[in-house]
Swiss-Prot record:
Pfam family, one: Rabaptin
Disulfide bridges in this chain: none
Quaternary organization: Heterodimer with RABGEF1. The dimer binds RAB5A that has been activated by GTP-binding. Interacts with SDCCAG8; this interaction is important for ciliogenesis regulation. Interacts with RAB4A; this interaction may mediate VEGFR2 cell surface expression.
Modified residues (Phosphoserine): S176, S180, S187, S191
GO cellular component terms listed in the entry, alphabetical order: centrosome; ciliary basal body; cytosol; early endosome; Golgi apparatus
Protein name: Rab GTPase-binding effector protein 2
Annotated PANTHER family: RAB GTPASE-BINDING EFFECTOR PROTEIN (PTHR31179), RAB GTPASE-BINDING EFFECTOR PROTEIN 2 (PTHR31179:SF6)
GO molecular function terms noted in the UniProt entry: growth factor activity; GTPase activator activity
Length: 554
């Protein structure tokens, strides 16, 4: 009976030991879980710190890249603007230079025209031609009265011949013969042999005096012939006609040869011998052939000149159209450049706005990061103090408290892990957005660079075409000016040659008139100095003076 209670008293001790052992094992397990949770928490803290540092580095890198891109775009824009301004200034200067060149060339053309006018003194030739025409008109004024006097003398001689024939037909009527012979002085007295002509001017020269003297001589011969015939008829009328009267009548009848033998060429014509006339005809035919060939060559040259002028006009039209197209393209390019500058400015403004937003976002993220760090530091400090207190203090006395502590620790670790995951996800989203914005900005920069490069190439091409067009325009203008000067020079030369030929012709006509008048004067003087009627008849029977050949032959 005593042994049984002793066994009953010893039985609770092993149970308590077993219970303590199980609790200690449970506690060690919980402590291990707590240590694992704390280690996991530390790992999560390290991951959070690494993610924060990575986020800060990524944001800083993105910010630096954005700043570099903005700076490069600004530099490119400044370079393009300065280059465009330089090109515009160069084009303006070149345009002013071209205007100055055009003005200078116009002045040179005027100076050349003045020199050409001075080199070809056509005024003096025209004055000489006018003087020659005046001389010919004056000579014509002298010759016309002489011709009238000659016609009057012919009429008088014809009337005298009629009277002589009437006397010869009626030799036995002395009264009527005497009356008819008395009519001769009556018919001669109303009109004198020659009226005094107008005094020739000094410009007419000796030709006018020679013609006037010639006219007086011819009139005196006719009056002498008529007077002699009338006197002989009046003296020997009752006795009939003697041989001397017949000779006088024949002399009177042949006296008409003197005015009839004088051939005065019409104005503008020249007296030439037959051989010279044939030679002149041959030369005229040759000159006609040469003139035809020259006219054909001139027509061909005119046709070529017309074609060249048409080609030049077409080229000028094409060049002007090309210049207008180039100017229009230049204006279009300037508009495109201005639009590109406006777009770049808008993009710069957008980039500045986005940069400002990114800086604000980075600032906000930094503030949040600092807040999180501030939250983590008190929590970690609180946890460290709690751990130290827990370590200092005794462990929970009961398993339920230990379970509660473990559950709370797990919940806190899970909440922190979720918060860190959310933060990491948000940071990843922000990084992706920043990368997308950076890619868009890079693509925009690349497109702007491509547009700028294309515009520069187009500007270079347009400048080259404009330069070539200007060179071609200057060449065509020089050719046109040269052709105009050549035409003007040829016209002036032709005019000079024509005026010289007319002057030589007028001088030759004047010389021929003078020689003819001198020859007539010499023959009249010979008639005046003749002593017998036979000498007068021989002089009158000589070859009539019809042209210059007769003068040369005589």
């Amino acid at each position: 009976m005593a042994a049984a209670p002793a066994t009953l008293a010893l039985d609770p001790q092993p149970q308590e030991k077993q219970k303590d052992a199980s609790e200690s094992s449970e506690l060690s397990r919980l402590r291990a879980e707590l240590a694992g949770a704390l280690a996991e928490m530390e790992t999560m803290k390290a991951v959070a710190e690494v993610s924060e540092s990575t986020k800060a580095e990524a944001v800083a890198a993105v910010q630096r890249q954005c700043q570099e891109e903005v700076a490069s775009l600004q530099a490119i824009l400044k370079d393009s603007i300065s280059s465009y301004e330089t090109q515009i200034a160069a084009l303006k200067q070149e345009r002013q230079q071209q205007q100055q060149d055009f003005e200078e060339k116009d002045r040179e053309l005027g100076h050349l025209k003045q020199l050409l006018a001075r080199a070809h003194p056509l005024d003096s030739l025209e004055k000489q031609m006018e003087k020659a025409h005046e001389d010919s008109e004056k000579l014509r004024e002298i010759v016309l009265p002489m011709e009238q006097e000659i016609t009057e003398l012919k009429g008088k001689l014809q009337r005298a011949e009629e009277l002589i024939q009437e006397i010869q037909r009626r030799p036995r009527q002395p009264a009527s013969l005497h009356g008819s012979t008395e009519l001769l002085p009556l018919s001669r007295n109303p009109s004198p042999p020659l009226e005094p002509l107008e005094e020739p001017s000094g410009d007419a020269g000796p030709a006018a005096e020679a013609f006037a003297h010639n006219c007086d001589d011819s009139a005196s011969i006719s009056s002498f012939s008529l007077g002699g015939a009338a006197g002989s008829a009046s003296l020997r009328g009752p006795q009939g006609l003697s041989p001397e009267q017949e000779e006088t009548a024949s002399l009177v009848s042949t006296g008409t040869l003197v005015p009839e033998g004088i051939f005065l060429p019409p104005p503008g014509y020249q007296l030439v011998p037959d051989s010279q006339w044939e030679q002149l005809q041959v030369e005229g035919r040759q000159l006609q052939k040469e003139l035809e060939s020259v006219s054909r060559e001139r027509d061909e040259l005119q046709e070529g000149l017309r074609r060249s002028n048409e080609d030049c006009a077409k080229q000028m039209q094409v060049l002007l159209a090309q210049v207008q197209n180039s100017e229009q393209l230049l204006r279009t390019l300037q508009g495109t450049v201005s639009q590109a500058q406006e777009r770049v400015q808008l993009q710069m403004a957008e980039l500045a706005t986005s940069h400002k937003c990114l800086s604000q976002e980075v600032k906000r993220l930094n503030e949040e990061n600092q807040g999180l760090r501030a939250e983590q530091l008190p929590s970690s400090a609180l946890q460290g103090s709690e751990q130290r207190e827990d370590q200092d203090e005794a462990l929970p006395s009961s398993i339920q408290e230990l379970h509660l502590l473990v559950q709370n620790t797990r919940q806190q670790a899970r909440a922190r892990q979720q918060a860190q995951e959310h933060e990491a996800e948000r940071l990843r989203i922000e990084i992706v957005k920043l990368r997308e914005a950076l890619d868009e900005e890079t693509a925009a920069k690349a497109s702007l660079e491509r547009q700028l490069r294309v515009q520069r190439e187009e500007t270079d091409v347009l400048e080259a075409s404009l330069c070539s067009l200007r060179i071609e325009t200057e060449r065509v203008q020089q050719e046109q000016r040269k052709a105009q000067l050549t035409d003007l020079l040829s016209e002036q030369r032709a005019k000079t040659l024509r005026l010289q030929a007319e002057l030589e012709t007028s001088e030759q006509v004047q010389r021929d008139f003078v020689r003819l008048s001198q020859a007539l004067q010499v023959r009249l003087e010979r008639i005046r100095q003749a002593e017998t009627l036979q000498q007068v008849r021989s002089i009158l029977d000589e070859a009539p003076l019809r042209d210059i050949r007769d003068i040369k032959d005589s």
